[in-house]
Amino acid sequence: MQEPGTPTEPDPAPITFERNPDDYLHWDLTFDPPIAYLSMNVDPGGATLGDYELKLNSYDIGVDIELASAVRRIRLEHPEVRCVVLMSAIQGTFCAGANIRMLAASSHAHKVNFCKFTNETRLEIEEASARSGLRFLAAINGACSGGGYELAMACDHLLLVDDSASAVSLPELPLLGVLPGTGGLTRLTDKRHVRRDRADMFATKPEGVRGREAVEWGLVDELAPISDFDESVRQRALALAATSDRDADAEPIMVPEMDPTIDGDTHRYRNVTAEHDRPNRSIDVTVHSDARPDWPLRTALELDDLLCHLRFNEPSVATIVLHARGSIDDVLAHDDQLANPANHAARETSLLWARVLSRLDLTARSLIATIEPGSCFAGILAELSLAADRTYMLEGTFEDDADHLPAAEVLLTPVNTGPMPMANGITRLRSRLWGDDTAHGEALDAVGQRLDAEAAESLGLV
């Protein structure tokens, strides 16, 4: 028991998720269109959470936040880039994976959210290639183990230096007695189609596999001699860039600063507000509609920043109550560009929304949506109510409402029928009505109709 008057340890500073490339501590980002070079150069003394040393390009959450920032900025701000080379600035070392001392000292909640965040970043790399035409090349110039190999496997092509020493490995099982935590085994078998017996053997070899054997087993795609490694990387990157459909002449989308205002228990962005109800371990998150052209991009970025903040800095929050306030017409003004993106800006904004909604799905809190007079759960914001575990809609109006707001309505649009898939590849509408094809068909027939509470309930939407 602590004696009265004994100084207490200050609460750790909250983890923040906005990063400017000029302030990156662990990554060097350079451009030689159509190629961007993203070089891992982890500062050993730049730990985010403690006094552990980030040796051998090992990473913690701060390193991966910068990686996520770099990938997002390349996608949005640099349409001229068609291939990203992930590489290392440390000779003989690509990446040693997640820092073991950091993991040992972290809470269980942090470990879970850390692994979840890092995998979401790798999923974004894969999605950028599959849906945005941005290719990724892993230039493996040295030892590549654990999470480092998981990062490399997220790329389209793995080029390993052939120096008789550099190897790829997943040493978690033999050295730590745990399975790889960021999709390593799944990518090994389901993505790279490594034969099962080889995958089993690989996962028990802490020294890993190198050279021609790594190519034969399908662990990497190509070898390059150390004397010609840099040129081999460039030529392979150019070949990958040639397969991209990105519009090099498109207007860049500059990432705005979020700059949230925090006043006690209120977290306020321009379009998103969060208010804590700490006694009940809940938080009210309100998305406000706006007809301004930058609303879709900015709102997605704000909601994403808030979700990351809640995951890492607010572990006591058990329930997120979702609100959407404003005009349905304002939301619909952005609907077509999200459902049918016709240019770089629209495509990247639509894909960003899909990723943010997936992060909401996987945030591991109870989600409740409340649809009331003044709500605007339509189109992209209807995805919030479809993501919720429980959705409640007020029938009629509040008797004591001084503003005399009209009764709440819900409106499904083409955005809700395919462009925003969940992580499992199906829509939230299909997931909500899973196993009932008749109900799903009736909901699709109601696309474009403004639904009151009775109609929404009859369709299974609330």
Residue ranges, per PLM feature:
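Amphipathic alpha-helical segments at domain termini/boundaries
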Residues: 1-47, 150-154, 193-295, 331, ...
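A structural preference for short, pocket-lining loop segments at secondary-structure junctions
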Residues: 33-40, 60-109, 119-139, 161-165, ...
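ABC transporter nucleotide-binding domains
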Residues: 49-50, 57, 301
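Alpha-helical scaffold segments in soluble metabolic enzymes
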Residues: 73, 120, 187, 213, ...
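Glycine-rich beta-to-alpha active-site loop
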Residues: 89-90, 125-176, 202-203, 207-208, ...
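Short beta-alpha connecting loops at secondary-structure transitions
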Residues: 105-106, 171-174, 186, 198-200, ...
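Active-site-proximal segments of catalytic enzyme domains
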Residues: 113
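Mobile "lid/hinge" segments at catalytic clefts and subdomain interfaces of large enzymes
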Residues: 169-200, 208-212
